[in-house]
């Protein structure tokens, strides 16, 4: 009998302990689920763009370097979405914040930044969405360009390296 009373008191103690926790806040979780967006193709998960060797004299009158294309390949696109835009982000240049800064170093070029252009060769400012690209079923290549541009009149030769990430936004 004593064991039964102890057991009941033990269970009551557990119940009372649970009531000691206070309700301090609420977490509301929401979102949306879309079927049939696109899959980023394996060859587009890491893209390397070679700008090549560009003569320093090319920039002497504010001219730009040549555009070098790169492609983001989407595949298995379904019919639930019709467009995609792309936002590129990275370290902005200190003078022209809409362009990528060149990584610093003892042998790095200076006075230049890297512009990212859409398929019509129009500048896409960093951290801003590109124009909308139409999607269709199957594989969809999205063409972009990287281009060296002077940001001041004191352009110095050297290595040019920069990194950017991109995010796809579907509609």
UniProtKB/Swiss-Prot annotation:
GO biological process, one term: cell adhesion involved in single-species biofilm formation
UniProt-listed SUPFAM superfamilies: Bacterial adhesins
Key words, A-Z: Signal
InterPro entries: Adhesion_dom_fimbrial, Adhesion_dom_fimbrial_sf, Adhesion_dom_sf, Bact_Fimbrial_Adh_Pro
Signal sequence coordinates: 1-17
Induction (UniProt): Expression is negatively regulated by H-NS and subjected to cAMP receptor protein (CRP)-mediated catabolite repression.
Keyword Signal recorded: yes
Gene Ontology CC terms: pilus
Entry annotated with the keyword Iron-sulfur: no
Note: The operon is cryptic under classical laboratory conditions, but is functional when constitutively expressed.
Function noted in UniProt: Part of the elfADCG-ycbUVF fimbrial operon, which promotes adhesion of bacteria to different abiotic surfaces.
PANTHER family the UniProt entry points to: FIMBRIAL SUBUNIT ELFA-RELATED, PROTEIN FIMF
Protein name: Uncharacterized fimbrial-like protein YcbV
Species this chain originates from: Escherichia coli (strain K12)
Upper classification of the organism: Bacteria, Pseudomonadati, Pseudomonadota, Gammaproteobacteria, Enterobacterales
């Amino acid at each position: 009998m004593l064991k039964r009373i102890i057991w009941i008191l033990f269970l009551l103690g557990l119940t009372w302990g649970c009531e000691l926790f206070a309700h301090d806040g609420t977490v509301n979780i929401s979102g949306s689920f879309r079927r049939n967006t696109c899959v980023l193709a394996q060859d587009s998960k890491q893209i390397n763009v070679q700008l090549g060797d560009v003569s320093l004299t090319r920039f002497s009158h504010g001219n730009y370097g040549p555009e070098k294309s790169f492609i983001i390949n989407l595949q298995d696109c379904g019919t639930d979405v019709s467009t995609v835009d792309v936002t590129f982000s990275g370290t902005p240049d200190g003078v022209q914040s809409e362009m990528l800064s060149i990584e610093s170093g003892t042998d790095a070029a200076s006075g230049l930044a890297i512009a990212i252009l859409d398929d019509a060769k129009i500048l896409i400012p960093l951290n801003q969405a590109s124009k909308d690209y139409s999607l269709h079923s199957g594989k969809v290549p999205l063409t972009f360009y990287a281009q060296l541009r002077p940001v001041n009149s004191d352009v110095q030769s050297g290595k040019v390296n920069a990194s950017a990430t991109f995010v796809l936004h579907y509609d």
